[in-house]
Amino acid sequence: CTNTGVNLLAPGKTPKNNIQFLAFFVNTIMAAHKFGVLFMASIATQSNSHRLGAHEAPPAVMSVFTGSTLSAVLDSLEQRVSEKKMTPDEKTEIKLDIGKIPNILLDNTDRNRTSPFAFTGNRFEFRATGSSNNCAAPLIVINTAIAEQLTQFKEEVDTDSYTHLRAHET
């Protein structure tokens, strides 16, 4: 949320709000991809490692669950956007489609309890912290990783090196 209470991970009703949502959503996923080892290190205890690796979900592997609706939206964008320079018509078509992102209901995102980092409609949940552990260290790591990724994203946008939205690096 912003300092005024705006949830940046809530899909909006307008194309502008959905672009904002997608930017924060994709950059949060990218932060988990880049810094997943740090996410896991922040929750590492002997008992939690045993719990994650043997008896309970989520597993000891860092993964992100987005739900089928958002996965389909991201897959569609990725297939339609390429490394080439986009024509104005292609850009307009994508902008129109971004405006059509459906309302994300808890029902279609919260089915997977085995992912340690899951999107649940308007937020990500980090489910790997042990029940008896303090969540301060994981929150510091996650917030710092997302801030670093957003800084890198802004630098790339400012230098025009981002010609399209991407959900992941290859």
Outline where the language-model segments fall.
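Generic structural hydrophobic/aromatic packing signal, biased to beta-strands
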Residues: 1, 28, 32, 119, ...
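Loop-rich catalytic cores of soluble enzymes, especially ATP-dependent carboxylate-amine ligases
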Residues: 1-111, 118, 160
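Generic recognition of flexible, low-complexity loop/linker segments
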Residues: 111-116, 133, 137
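Conserved small/polar residues in nucleotide/adenosyl-binding loops
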Residues: 163-170
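An acidic, glycine-/histidine-flanked metal-binding catalytic module
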Residues: 123, 127-129, 134-158
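Low-complexity, intrinsically disordered regions enriched in charged/polar residues
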Residues: 67-71, 95-98, 136, 140, ...
